[in-house]
Amino acid sequence: LSPQNQLMDLHVREVFFTVNGWPVVSPERYAGTAPRSFTKEDLAGEWEIIRLQEPPLERSLEAGQIMWGEGDLRNGEQALSARVVLEADGSVGDATWDFNVKKQLLTIKTATEDINNLIIFAGHDWENETETILFTGLDAQGHSVWGKRIN
């Protein structure tokens, strides 16, 4: 854990498994939101998406822990979210999206990659204090991709 406690600690998160069997977690803390199914129309709207990447810098570790003085994020290390709009026509900027209603899985296709089988579920947006639609999954490199509908 970071000496300055910048990492998530003692947050309970819902765990899901991808179609390939990999565990992934909710982008938001667990709130006991009742499960439900969604339609493609439910997903259209403004989303906040974040992709978690490997840190570009090496860190000194002691027994798996970040050393004192190594806990501050440096330029380029912070994973920043982006706001995107999933349009009702299946477009998202220069990319496209599709939703498998039966399996409740989202796919986003860009010019350079396809992010497949993002798990859609109901959850709580703690920042905006409301129930919302969330997704979690992995990109082709195995990095987490999280999203929450914000409008």
Where are these regions (language model features)?
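Carbohydrate-active catalytic/glycan-binding domains of CAZyme proteins
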Residues: 1-151
